[in-house]
Amino acid sequence: MSVVLIVEDNDKNMKLVRDVLQFKGYQTLEATSGREGVRMAIELLPDLVLMDIQLPDMDGVSALAEIRAHPHGRKIPVFAVTASVMPHDQKRIEASGFDAFISKPINVKSFVETVGRFVAARKERSE
């Protein structure tokens, strides 16, 4: 079973993403802050991290940089998940090294397809 770490501080968004992923057969882990997300990503090595950009203690871009600084963290796909769709924000996010960008509100169909593609590719590379 593939494991997805959700880093999200909004309870409603967390519940939606968790419920969709669990319905599709993924195991989910949850973190409500950037620092907790970094720690869990490095310690638990999930198949995918879904990282909110605006978090209370550390933004998602900074959290990604810390994950990528760790040798094992370079191999984990990390998606930016954000409601911020301003062009300058999106360019900054894309330049940060995220593997994909998912905008809120989430389109469930495309979200599930994107997650599935990345998890399958990661599983193939690790075999």
Model feature map: region roles:
Residues 39, 61-74:
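Short amphipathic alpha-helix used as the core "switch/output" element in two-component signaling
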